[in-house]
Amino acid sequence: MQTSMIAAIYKNFLGHAPDWYKKTIIAFLIVNPFIFMVDPYIAGWTLVIQFIFTLAMALKCYPLQPGGLLLIEAMFIGMTSPGHMMHEIEVNLEVLLLLVFMVAGIYFMKDLLMFLFTKLVIKVRNKLILSLSFIFASAFLSAFLDALTVVAVIISVGLGFYSIYHKVASGKEFHSDHDHTSDDELGSHDLEDFRAFLRNLMMHSAVGTALGGVMTMVGEPQNLIIADKAGWDFVEFFIRMAPVTLPVFVFGLLTTVVLEKTGTFSYGAKLPSAVRQILVDYNDHMDKGRSKRETAKLVVQALIGIWLIVGLATHMASVGLIGLSVIVLATSMSGVIEEHALGKAFEEALPFTALLCVFFGVVAVIIDQGLFQPVIHWVLSFEGETQMVMFYLANGVLSMVSDNVFVGSVYITEVTAALEAGQITRDQYDMLAVAINTGTNLPSVATPNGQAAFLFLLTSAIAPLLRLSYGRMVMMALPYTIVLTIVGLVATYIGLADATQVLYDMHLIEHHTAVEAGAQAVGH
């Protein structure tokens, strides 16, 4: 039977995505212009919900295509403009450069990462201690590096472990070429247990980036914006956040202990003994067969790792440029000089970079259609500690839906305007800045669209291998979401004002004048 041209086009549309999914996207594209004609505000929220739906279905179809189609249509019907989308991309250029260069840079350091993490996983037999070491390490690193960089490291390590086991279990040698996406030659029981084990470590690490990232001004992009507007330096930012961030960090680690001990929310998965043996054999094989040149590579990569941490922690250059320097140093000192060998490093990050640009287009729609304005004005109508709590909650809820960088920057801009208009005092402003920072960083672990690092993990090459779907990520993050949100909320409501006063009395921080924030804000 001959296929008609329309049927052929439909078959090609979104490839092997399920039929119901294709029809759903087509339905979205048909109804959106009509909703926009009736009520642009409702149309804006409809588009945001549809975009979140494409993220939730990331394992069925990469979100770039359906999300991109929805955005292109939104541009044509006037929900936003290419110029505004371009502006949002320009504002977030550092994040895009970070993705392109830093993730590729990490790729060229994977020999060192595998060397270190294989030793860690083999030596630490206790899963609880291993989980705590992963969450603590990712929190510590995220306080100085960018969360995306830390997640890129963890993904690289996870992929390394997975491919080693997959090769050996499929009857291949460590150095054989092998397709680790095909499970045909494997025993399924150990593989499922190993997937569960790696999923646990991935999620603990991802949450760790949020715990550490909230503490310092370099931890997350929106922290820099908030510190900049408020005129705080690195130390002052850390001290002002401490009354909320330190209790949250402690309770975050306690949550890890409870989850690993009880085995709830699919945590507590152990490393199967057969897989451990393969990793031990791999470690021995690599140690025995390591040549002088390979040892030299590891030493150079360790030195580059030190440069990476020092460069990022001291802000010697923008994150993307430091990533570019890592690529240049790592490849030139490892002898990787062919274009095709360089190209492999960019495969992981570029699809996500394109997706993030689409995401910034959706942010442009949110701004142009004023989707968050009613919430912002409502929150500003409160006073005192209630206002701080409402800021924290409103930031948290909106950060679960939208990008937390956008939410944080919108709120701090609104609060700075309120300060300049004389609606709030400078001391109130400083405490609201703490509530905004913690509100955007902590509850946003609830969904992958809240944190760029979580979204990167969801759309990375490792997610389908570990069966890490949007729903599963939300479910595994749920206990952390509840604990971090509640502890952060209680610390903001009960402890923040008193603790800040104690810090003033101890002269660890000083009172600012309203003029400082105004001058800072005008400059940016």
From Swiss-Prot:
Residue spans crossing the bilayer: 25-45, 97-117, 135-155, 234-254, 302-322, 352-372, 388-408, 445-465, 474-494
Protein's cellular compartments: Cell inner membrane
GO terms, molecular function: sodium:proton antiporter activity
InterPro entries xrefs: Na+/H+_antiporter_NhaB
Record-linked Pfam families: NhaB (PF06450)
Reaction catalysed by this enzyme: 2 Na(+)(in) + 3 H(+)(out) = 2 Na(+)(out) + 3 H(+)(in)
Keyword list, A-Z: Antiport, Cell inner membrane, Cell membrane, Ion transport, Membrane, Sodium, Sodium transport, Transmembrane, Transmembrane helix, Transport
Regions annotated as coiled coil: none
Membrane topology: Multi-pass membrane protein
Main location: membrane
Keyword Membrane: yes
GO cellular component terms attached to this protein's record: plasma membrane
Task of the protein: Na(+)/H(+) antiporter that extrudes sodium in exchange for external protons.
Annotated family: Belongs to the NhaB Na(+)/H(+) (TC 2.A.34) antiporter family.
Protein name: Na(+)/H(+) antiporter NhaB
Source organism: Alteromonas mediterranea (strain DSM 17117 / CIP 110805 / LMG 28347 / Deep ecotype)
Gene that encodes the chain: nhaB
